[in-house]
Structure formats: C-alpha cells, structure tokens
Amino acid sequence: MRLFDPHIHMTSRTTDDYEAMYAAGVRAVVEPSFWLGQPRTSPASFLDYFDSLLGWEPFRAAQHGIAHHCTLALNPKEANDPRCVAVLDELPRYLVKDQVVAVGEIGYDSMTPAEDTALAAQLELAAAHELPALVHTPHRDKLAGLRRTLDVVRESALPVDHVLIDHLNETTVKEAKDSGCWLGFSVYPDTKMDEERMVAILRAYGPERVLVNSAADWGRSDPLKTRKVADLMLAEGFDEDDVDRVLWRNPVAFYGRSGRLTLDVTTPDATHEGNSILRGAPKGPGGGPAEDPGAGPAGAVADRHGATAVPGA
Amino acid sequence: MTRPRTSPATPGADTADDPLTDPATGTGPRPVAGTAADGTPTGAATDPDPGTATLATATPRELRGHLTARLDEPARGWLRRALDEAVDHPGTHGPISVWELRIAEAGRRCGPVHADAARVLILHAARADADALSRVYYQGTGAERRAVLYALPHLVPGPEGLPLVEDALRTNDTRLVTAAVGPYAARHLDAHAWRHAVLKCLFTGVPVDAVADLDHRAHRDTELARMLTDYAAERTAAGRAVPADLHRVLTLTDPPATPSAPATDHG
Ligand SMILES: [Zn+2]
C-alpha cells in the first residue's frame, strides 16, 4: 500500500514519526506553510520558514525515504497582522521553486477584509505561476466560510479544478463537491473528521476528487491517519483500487498540476555519491543521518526500511 | 545496499509518450538516467563514462557535453535556450533576472539527477560573480545552494565566496557539506576551519573523497592528527566503531600519526 499525505506539517514532527509513516506506507507528503502557534512579527521569519520547507525538511524526509514537497503562502490568521503582510511581496520569487506544488494554505480564519484581500491576491499568484491552490475552510462558521471562499475562487483567474478545498465535513462536502473543486478531509484524533465519518462520506459521495490527510502538526494529531483511513476503507468493503485512488492517485493528480512533483527520492544519493556528476547510481552505504558515521547510519536506515515490508503491500 | 525507492509510485511513467511530463500521473520531468525501482542503476549510471570528473572540477565544456549526451530532446532544448538567455542577459532585470528563474526551475526541466550540472552551467553562462552567487545561494533551495557551491571554484577567484562555504559547513545537510568541501574550500579555508570541515565529514558520514586536495592539505598537519586521534579515542571509549575514513586521513597526516593505535600518544 502506497500512501500520500497531501497535508501534513512535518516541521512539527519527530524522526520517530517519519519512521512510523514510512513503515505504514507513506512515500510522499506535501507540507503546507501555516501558522506556527506562536505569532510571527515580521516577514523575515516567514522567509526562514519557507527556506526550511525548501531545504532542511525535504532533506529530513529524504533520509526516511519520503518525497517532500510544499505549498507556500501567507496563512489566513497572520494575513490580519500588518507586520506580516509584506511577505506577499516576497512570495513570487518562492513560487518558482521546484518543490513548490501549490499556493497554500490560504483561505479564511475570521473572515475579515484583510483575509479577503490576501485570499484574492494569492489566488491570482497561483494562476500567474500555473500552480494549484490549497484553500482551507475556517474552523468557526464553516458553511458560511465555505460559501464565501467559493465566491472568491469563482471570481479568481484560477480554474476550480486547480483548487483543493480542505478541512471539509458533513455540512460542507456537498456544496464543495458541486463547485467542481477537489475535496480535502483532515482526519484528526478528536476534531474535524474521524476515520468512520470519513468512510461514510466516501460511501455517500464516492472517491472522485477526494483527498484525505492527517494535517498533523504541533497540536494533538496523528501522522498515521492516512493509513488508518485506508485500513478502514478496506474493512468496510472498498477495494484496493479505491484506496489507491484516494490515498495516492488523487493527490498525485491534484499536485501534479504544478508539473513539479518528483516522487523518486533521489537526494540521499548525493551523500554517498560525493560530488560526482554521475549522481543517481548508489554505490553503497554512507552518509545518512548526521553525527553517527561509524555504524553506517544510512545503511541501517535502509535496512530498517527494507525489513519493514509495507503492511498490505 | 540501496535507499528505499518510490519509483513504483509512478505507474506508466516508463511508457509515457512525453518523457518530460507524464500526464497520467502528473509527475514532473524525470531524469533520463537514474535508478530503477529496485535501486539498480539505469541509463547513464551504467554507461562507460568513468565518472572521474566532478561538478566541482569539470569544465563547463565537459559539463555541457555530459548533459547533452544524457538529456532528452525537450530538456536539451530548454537548457540550450536557458544558456543563451543567460549569455545575452547576464545582469539583473526587474525583480528577478531570467537566468535566476531558469536556475529555480532546472530540476523540473532536467530532472533531479541532472539539475546540479544544469544550474552550474547557467551560473557560468551568466558570468555570476560573488554578489550574484551570494544572492542565488541565500535565496535558494537546498539544491540551488548546492549548485552555487559547485560553481564557486570556477567563478570566484578570490575569497569573497567563503561566507557561503562557511554557511554550508554549519548545516547538517550532508548534500551541502559535500558540496562545500570542494576545490574552493581547499584553496581558501584557513587551517582551523578546514580541519573542522574534515572532522564534520567524518561526523556526518560524508566520504572524505569529497574533500578536495585532501592529501596535500592533510600532509604533516599535526593538529589535524591530534583532532582525529582524540575523536577516535572518544568513539572507542564509547564502544563505537571508528570510521574507516578517519584512519585514512590520519595516514595522510603522515609521520606523527600511528593509525593502528589511534587512541594513544596524542593527548
Ligand atoms: Zn494545516
């Protein structure tokens, strides 16, 4: 079973999580930029964060055999802080980067005029950079937030099939589906959506254009929720093809609209290939996790991955 | 032993009509040569090229020949246009110069395997100086920073690029550390920083083969020998293996060191 978590904040997660995700079958993730829990006070801290999503975090993911891409944006909450809004001027030079597969997460938090402006501006940026957009729906006043979101999307230059509406639930799924957008569901331990409700929605609305994510972050969350949904789908009568569609092919199709998805994990080779121009031909163990050479760390990781045959694969 | 692969995740990729972008999966440009699902090298990886030239030592002409032989036609055409643009418009125009945009998109155009070489070539074509290289580095992804480090020895004759090398050596990203210890570092890093770079390679598992001019700089370096023996003693005391590369470098430091007894005599 191959799994793609299309919305997870790995910066907030440990290497144990990476290992468990790999063992569960996760081979690709998309990490949207978001609010860090502690408010930022300047564009500079956004830029360091973006750089981390394009540098250190994909390196970490690659060490665990997981392909890492990101979506970049000014998040809705901080769009309300005038000290942060200037980051919008820096976004264009980031949106051209290879690993950026969408603009996001954007959308509404408190549905303020400042959020209107940031959402509309960033949908235009997505269209200008031929990128899809990851648009989340607010936690509070969700249905009204969805409707206002869809209005702004329809007024934008971005086609609806380039938009993923996330954090949907029973009250918002129908209107979101009717809009023609892609449908995202965040499965959390105790809020938003759980596995049983997710499977019920899949039964009622079908697997077309549906993406399931863990949205795991620094809050109470579970980076293995994609696997748990897959298992429950199988137990409830969906077949392997349905599971593969929802948990692999749909996210690949959506983010693939960027033309920038690279699902081969090639980066660790750079370590043991030295600086030969003939990278991509593994010669043997070496490199890998920092600060532990003697034991052949990369080899150990590869062994562990090799031994942990993906359950159900 | 090979890294885990996710190639099976792109079904149909091998049969797509357009090898650059697979419409069935939406995956971006794929490398012409690379690694198959089971980790065995394919394409260029098995061709007779001895592979002795490195990104840091190959001339632009060699790099171009290498890429031209390996890229498919759409990627080759893209690279040709990108290099022509960079030659014609090397400066900064508007918020971002055209060649810097090409640097950013080299991965999806040429595939991750060839992106480093393509970026180094674009930097050459644009005659990027130390200021331009700093800008590309500090505004770059990990992959772009790596390419800047590989380009440094060709494009910056003086020590102005050292802050980039020092920045890369502070990271724990082994791809950056590997690229940082090339000929530019050999030429310009002072003794203290260079010794720490060698030690960092040993710590992070970067093969010391990546360290340019290692034989020459390590020769008769008694301070490096002391650092290596202390590190070996620390590993031994902890019951952990001493990296084979450590003994190799210790041997290069020559007379004072006794590789067979690394934990003693050098307090
Ligand atoms: Zn999120």
Question: Over which residues does each language-model region extend?
Answer:
Chain B
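Eukaryote-skewed repeat-based solenoidal scaffolds used as protein-protein interaction platforms
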Residues: 116-118, 122-227
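N-terminal alpha-helical scaffold/docking segments in eukaryotic complex subunits
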Residues: 1-126, 194-267
